[in-house]
Regions:
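Flexible, polar/acidic helix-loop-strand segments at domain edges
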Residues: 71-72, 170-258
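Extracytoplasmic
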Residues: 71-74, 91-97, 106-114, 125, ...
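Second-shell loop/turn segments in exported
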Residues: 85-88, 128-136, 151-156, 210, ...
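Extracytoplasmic/secreted envelope proteins and their assembly/folding machinery
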Residues: 96, 127, 139-147, 162-166, ...
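Entry/capping segment at the start of metal-dependent catalytic domains
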Residues: 17-107, 281, 314
């Protein structure tokens, strides 16, 4: 073979290799996008929402904070909605509330799950469960609640209807999960409503005994929503993370065409305050982001049987001020932080209202989880 032909062959091989690499990179990017969307569905983060024409965008024009800048980090509120009407605005209670804090230098992302039954100050006046804020005023009210009570500077949000998760799981042919007797019974019960809302079918597990099962979209979403077992809302968070991991693993096995179909399917279930320019800016570093530590808030808590003037079950921080200190130590370990007067006032009010006080031996300490 002549040198000229060898050179041509080499060029052809290089071109083929470039095309393969381009396709592989595009597939990897789509996998990351979908993983982040799934994270958001379960209350985590979504950065790569490229097909923006299909998303619902809400401009947050009246975001408030307690005067804190928190430079060096980008904080995003993530809401997983329990929507029956496919409406992503106010009127929906948030099934999941999370905060994604991105270290702009290292690209590491820390996630904090705020327990939805946590009693916090709402609209600067009354006290209610954290998940009530979105229902009353939509994403802007919910973001302001997080900023006011936790001394944060969140400027953006992403909301996803949890029903989108059922679509994704069905399109990756389900996930396999090990269930307890109690979980099978509760999942079967949740499936009735989930099936009705999604219009999707499922097969009831009978007999309802412990075992390893392949779950379709309706079943997996129902499993992730179970609350009424040992561990309550805290155990529910563990289930959500398991569904996330299982779904992410299946996404990595899909081809480019399937990934595109999945994105087209779930985009109408996404609402965000990010502009196209902001999302593309985040997306350019998609491969550099690394999901790091996660924890739940509050760190120290009680669930009193009764609170004067309130009915139902509430999660009460054992000293909001002390818990917020721990939160900042978790999110920003190398930055000094002193609670604002706003957080101190809210903390004192919660103490007086609920008769739940901080542990004096733990006050001001940090327990990263």
């Amino acid at each position: 073979m002549s040198k000229r032909n060898k050179k041509r062959l080499t060029r052809r091989q290089q071109e083929i290799r470039r095309k393969r690499l381009k396709k592989r990179r595009r597939r990897r990017r789509l996998v990351i996008i979908l993983e982040l969307i799934i994270l958001c569905i379960l209350g985590t983060t979504a950065f790569g929402l490229f097909k923006l024409g299909k998303t619902e965008r809400t401009n947050l024009s009246n975001i408030k904070n307690n005067g804190l800048k928190q430079t060096g980090y980008t904080n995003v509120a993530l809401f997983g909605l329990d929507s029956r009407e496919k409406n992503l605005g106010k009127g929906n209670r948030t099934d999941t509330i999370m905060i994604a804090s991105i270290n702009n230098e290292t690209k590491k992302v820390k996630l904090v799950s705020v327990y939805r039954d946590t009693m916090l100050k709402q609209n600067g006046e009354h006290y209610d469960k954290a998940n009530a804020a979105y229902s009353v005023g939509g994403p802007e009210t919910a973001v302001n609640m997080l900023n006011e009570n936790l001394d944060l500077n969140i400027q953006d949000y992403v909301s996803v209807n949890f029903l989108a998760l059922a679509d994704v799981i069905d399109m990756v042919d389900g996930i396999t999960v090990k269930l307890t007797d109690e979980e099978v019974v509760n999942m079967n019960n949740y499936c009735v409503e989930t099936s009705k809302v999604t219009g999707k079918k499922y097969k009831k597990i009978e007999p309802a005994v412990a075992g390893t099962y392949k779950l379709n979209g309706v079943q997996a979403v129902s499993y992730a929503r179970i609350r009424y077992t040992a561990g309550g809302d805290y155990k529910r968070t563990e289930r959500q993370r398991l569904v996330l991991k299982k779904t992410a693993d299946k996404l990595k096995q899909q081809d480019l065409a399937t990934l595109n179909k999945i994105i087209d399917k779930v985009m109408p279930e996404v609402s965000t305050s990010f502009t196209t320019k902001e999302i593309l800016s985040l997306a350019t570093g998609a491969f550099d982001y690394e999901l790091g530590e996660t924890t739940g808030f509050p760190f120290d808590l009680e669930t009193p049987e009764q609170i004067p003037g309130y009915s139902g079950s509430y999660v009460i921080p054992k000293g909001l001020e002390e818990n917020v200190i721990k939160l900042h130590q978790f999110l920003y370990p190398n930055k000094d932080y002193t609670p604002t007067a706003t957080v101190t006032d809210i903390s004192n009010t919660l103490n007086d209202m609920t008769n739940v006080y901080p542990n004096t031996t733990e006050s001001g300490t940090s327990q990263n989880e």
